[in-house]
């Protein structure tokens, strides 16, 4: 009894604290590495993960460089961990086809972090399963050639402001960062086309829309918070969603209120009075269900296999009423995605194309001749003439997107356990398509670091191995806005090159340093000179 009493005394004393501390440390040690055996069990090679954070430090130089390193060290099928989340990285064309097309029903959804802005989460980019299918089907009509043709004048109006600004640099002869000019220009396009709110970023940098756009793209998660989110996602992600965040709430509130005000105004107007912009196209489609099936959603396939802008017969059907019309939040979400793609991706694509033309004057001269001939025939270009009348510009843009794909990685989630070409994929796994590594694989693209638009002649395209060129993804969940994005890039370069010639100068960084926190872009801008023609 005395012994038991002694034991009881000790158990109730400091040893309890010590025992609990040891148990907690042991639990933390186990937790810190418990998620890091899954890739090995799948037979996939990967960098050695660090406790809690996985391979976060592997990506400190940026996702673009690290993607290339992963492909080089571990092959076309490998993996990594960000915190406790496992990623399976694929740069093998046949397997990509299986994931994006053949087994699409099991890989319908994109990965979501749970931290997306409310407006982004309600966009077609992140909607899931049946609701994604309904909204995507409704929005398909907003990107028809007929609807896009109505947006050409709005893009051209914003381009006029860009040309006036560039003229000052041509007159001064000074080197300048043309990426900053494209940033202002794409802000104007997004405001006008997606939010129904014309702005002039050049003359009114303090405009509320301009300021909130800059705040949105400057928004980032502090590194210590990121480490906590990755290390303890089941606790930290729900906590981050409910905790007050003034910056996030102000941005959400501004864009939401802006769209709601425009919708209220449009609903009061007669149809002929309404501005014909992207927002109106979405509003027109909000009650209409598409008669198409998921198999008809692959708009990228249509764009790259079409002969001009002839309508697709499978899409010539009358829509039926939608069982659950698009909500205001979902309409705001589509405008928000236009903001992300229209600002960052279009800006970077224009910047890369300008850099490549400035540093490859022979290609630029060939393009200038095509532009001049086109302008003689089409002083006010329309969508169809842009689609069919500028083959070399198409080749230049295609090669730009091969070398510098802004969306150089995208994901799909496995809904159920499955096997893809002999590789076991567990339910919930995140599959990452390594577009950058694929586009720079010499097996598919000889001399991949060389700018060569001739890779994309009509004859050369026929020789490309399928699923080795994915700047807009592939399959039913490929980029819905591909036509609009290409239209904006083509129309901009057409107008700019009709007036100016790009010149490399001592300030031009060759080769460009790249930044890849999200989309791929120039790290230090694109400094060139321009000369009036």
From Swiss-Prot:
Q: Mutating residue 356 to V: what's the consequence?
A: In allele CYP5A1*5; KM value about 1.5 higher for PEG2; Vmax/KM approximately 27% of that of the wild-type
* InterPro entries reported for this sequence: Cyt_P450 (IPR001128), Cyt_P450_CS (IPR017972), Cyt_P450_E_grp-I (IPR002401), Cyt_P450_sf (IPR036396), Cytochrome_P450_3A (IPR050705)
Tissue-specificity statement: Platelets, lung, kidney, spleen, macrophages and lung fibroblasts.
Xref: Pfam families: p450
Q: Where are the transmembrane segments?
A: 11-31, 76-96, 224-244, 336-356
**Which CDD domains does the record cross-reference, listed alphabetically?**
CYP5A1
SUPFAM superfamilies referenced in this protein's UniProt entry, alphabetically: Cytochrome P450
Q: Which UniProt keywords apply?
A: Disease variant, Endoplasmic reticulum, Fatty acid biosynthesis, Fatty acid metabolism, Heme, Iron, Isomerase, Lipid biosynthesis, Lipid metabolism, Lyase, Membrane, Metal-binding, Monooxygenase, Oxidoreductase, Prostaglandin biosynthesis, Prostaglandin metabolism, Transmembrane, Transmembrane helix
Q: Kindly list the GO molecular function terms attached to this UniProt entry.
A: 12-hydroxyheptadecatrienoic acid synthase activity; heme binding; hydroperoxy icosatetraenoate dehydratase activity; iron ion binding; monooxygenase activity; oxidoreductase activity, acting on paired donors, with incorporation or reduction of molecular oxygen; thromboxane-A synthase activity
Query: Its GO CC terms?
Result: cytosol; endoplasmic reticulum; endoplasmic reticulum membrane
* Presence of keyword Endoplasmic reticulum: yes
Quickly give the catalysed reaction.
prostaglandin H2 = thromboxane A2; prostaglandin H2 = (12S)-hydroxy-(5Z,8E,10E)-heptadecatrienoate + malonaldehyde; a hydroperoxyeicosatetraenoate = an oxoeicosatetraenoate + H2O; (15S)-hydroperoxy-(5Z,8Z,11Z,13E)-eicosatetraenoate = 15-oxo-(5Z,8Z,11Z,13E)-eicosatetraenoate + H2O
Entry's Gene Ontology BP terms = icosanoid metabolic process; intracellular chloride ion homeostasis; positive regulation of vasoconstriction; prostaglandin biosynthetic process; prostanoid biosynthetic process; response to ethanol; response to fatty acid
Disease link: Ghosal hematodiaphyseal dysplasia: Rare autosomal recessive disorder characterized by increased bone density with predominant diaphyseal involvement and aregenerative corticosteroid-sensitive anemia. Aregenerative anemia is characterized by bone marrow failure, so that functional marrow cells are regenerated slowly or not at all. Thromboxane synthetase deficiency has been detected in some patients with a bleeding disorder due to platelet dysfunction.
The name this protein carries in UniProt is Thromboxane-A synthase
Q: What is the lineage of its organism?
A: Eukaryota, Metazoa, Chordata, Craniata, Vertebrata
